[in-house]
A protein has these predicted regions:
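Hydrophobic anchor at the beta1->P-loop junction of P-loop NTPases
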Residues: 6
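The conserved Walker
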Residues: 10
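Conserved lysine of the Walker
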Residues: 14
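Conserved substrate/cofactor phosphate-moiety recognition/catalytic segment
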Residues: 19-65
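Glycine-rich phosphate-binding loop used to anchor ATP phosphates in small-molecule kinases
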Residues: 52-108
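Short, amphipathic alpha-helical "lid/cap" segments that border enzyme active or binding sites
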Residues: 57, 61, 173-181
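Conserved phosphate-donor/acceptor-positioning beta-strand/loop module used by diverse small-molecule
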Residues: 98-120, 166
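Small-molecule kinase domains that catalyze NTP-dependent phosphoryl transfer to phosphate-bearing small molecules
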Residues: 122, 126-175
Length: 187
């Protein structure tokens, strides 16, 4: 079973790249906004939205982990490396997928802020993520989180056997996904 965790700052390309990697391995993609966008229209964008989203995600992970015939899952998310609770979140995911048959791949994406700001308003992103359609709010969230949190790791900070960090600033989603697919196939 392949568990592919794709993380990085907002608008780095996690969902688009994750879709292509998912197609290559015939794995479903649970991108960050699937659960968030199902909740926020009803209760707003607040702490409860994130709490409920996490409950749904963990329920999905537990179901997948128990099903030995399941091929796996791709999950995309933002990891704030300066927040201990995010490290705890990763620990919980690792505890759920703790069988020897579970292969967890950690893929970190990075891109410079100007490129992420450009990607933040692409037609495809706005089509797939309703909460990003308020461009002003989305831009503010992206830039504020970049100032407030460290959304990419330091060198050697992520201590996982199957870990790849990829700067996608000047790569297309296709080029990025091909590099990730090749890396997974060699691990």
């Amino acid at each position: 079973m392949k568990i592919i965790l794709i993380f990085g700052p907002q608008a780095v390309g996690k969902m688009t790249i994750g879709e292509k990697v998912g197609d290559a391995f015939d794995l479903p993609l649970l991108h960050n906004h699937v659960t968030l966008d199902a909740i926020w229209p009803y209760i707003g964008w607040n702490k409860d939205t994130f709490r409920l989203s996490d409950q749904i995600r963990m329920g999905i992970f537990e179901h997948v982990a128990k099903d030995d015939s399941h091929p796996g899952i791709i999950f995309t998310f933002v990891w704030a490396f300066d927040m201990q609770e995010d490290w705890g979140y990763i620990k919980t995911i690792k505890e759920i997928f703790n069988k020897e048959s579970h292969n967890i791949y950690f893929v970190e994406l990075a891109a410079d802020l100007d490129e992420r700001i450009r990607r933040n308003t692409t037609e495809y992103r706005l089509e797939k993520k309703p909460s990003k359609r308020n461009i002003e709010f989305s831009h503010a969230e992206l830039t504020n989180s970049a100032e407030k949190h460290r959304l990419n790791s330091y060198e050697n900070e992520v201590q996982e056997d199957k870990y790849l960090k990829l700067d996608v600033t000047s790569l297309t989603a296709e080029e990025s996904s091909q590099k990730i697919i090749a890396w997974i196939n060699n691990n």
